[in-house]
């Protein structure tokens, strides 16, 4: 099953890069998202809340943004880490940023039920009990 989960996450990532939209059918209707890069650390639940996180809360900081998937790590039967090279320009500052971000996905019954966004591969690995 874990190989199928890696492919699901890869397809989700490719869809987002190509369209700028999540593949909503791959996200459970009650998906939970936690962005560990946002100060308030609030949890987002469901498609409408995920849309707000992506296109309002998170995106409001950037005037330009791109992410290119670099690696997919099969953690266990439910979890996959996606590592991406992120480039962004600050909306207020104009400062350019490039870093490697990582997302821990939890997959059940061929749908993503939880997303944890980290601003480094190391943070994501530590969150699942691994290290480089």
Describe each region flagged by the PLM.
Residues 76-86:
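A short hydrophobic beta-strand element
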Residues 102-126:
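Short beta-strand edge/turn micro-motifs at domain boundaries
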